Amino acid sequence: MKATTGGLAGLAAFTALALACNPDKGPVGLIPPTFDRLSEASSAPLVQHIVAPQATDPAIDQALDNHYAWLDTTGRTNHKLFVFMPGTGLTPAVYQLVQQEAARVGYHVIGLMYPNRPGLAKVCPSDPDPAACYENSRLEIIDGIDRSPWVDVNAANSIDNRLTKLLQYLARQYPDEGWDRFLAHDKPKWSQMAVSGHSQGGGHAAMIAKIRLVARVVMFSSVTDSLQGASVPWVATHVTPSDRYYGFDHDLDEQFRSIRASWDSLGMAAFGPAVAPENSAPPYDFTHMLVTDYHPLRGPGRPAHSSSCTDFNTPLAADGTPVFLDAWRYFLTTRSSDEDDTDDETSSASAARRDP
């Protein structure tokens, strides 16, 4: 265990908090959402755990880069777990800034390593049934049931098992930190989790929310699955309500057309048009879609596609804080009208009945 400040020198002030009290800014016909500024977020060092996947389960033998776990033991908690999944070929280590911010606003946080090669956007277009390829490959990566010739993920290496075994490990090693609250009968308590990820990882977050009721879905530069720019069928139906989905991308992302089509298919446009965060301020008229054209940092990979949240491409202010800090915090803390704060067996049992 070690503590880290993560290089965040401070938190940007929100200049439009008063908008959160204006019901005219909410979606027409719905109870307006609320925006929790959390202006007293802790500046204390975060607790960080770096865990090798195979240390949690010796049967895990793929994608062995470290998991990351974070929490702020001095600040207030929202009793939710934020699970972040990296994009193709990347690891939780290159997304530490957004993970740290989630911890600072009250989440327990896991950056989850999982088998994320090959890139589905590379292989599925050549499949005889691309739509089925995207869906079946994602499901296999999540639960380890053999469905796709393009990926080779068994139950031990699946997202489900990795998350379960990591939570069990953290609960055993650090019993006073509260990781066990996110397990029920040795399974993840999905109703108490915000699932998130970048690119391929954001698509897995959306797939998890399709088949299970989750507290929130935050998609960075995702979902990229498409059929000639149109959204694939699996995106259109989902157990998690549309008002719990949020998306962030760069308008120069070469996959932006596909990503925006997926947001429309998820029903996110019902909550207002996309907003450029650099030209606005929270709560961004309560939109569920943020699209930037802010110049990304140069670095490896595709800077526009990665600028939404990777440490090496997301732009930084003069004081070293991420330019998109307010946007991240908005997605992490704004509340939908039906969001459930309960943390009891009734809630988890209801969610479990929805799980496959």
Language-model region placement:
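Gly/Ala-rich beta-loop-alpha elbow adjacent to hydrolase catalytic centers
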Residues: S196-G201, A205
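Short beta-strand element of the alpha/beta-hydrolase
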Residues: H79-G87
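Short amphipathic alpha-helix adjacent to the substrate-entry channel of hydrolases
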Residues: Y95-I110
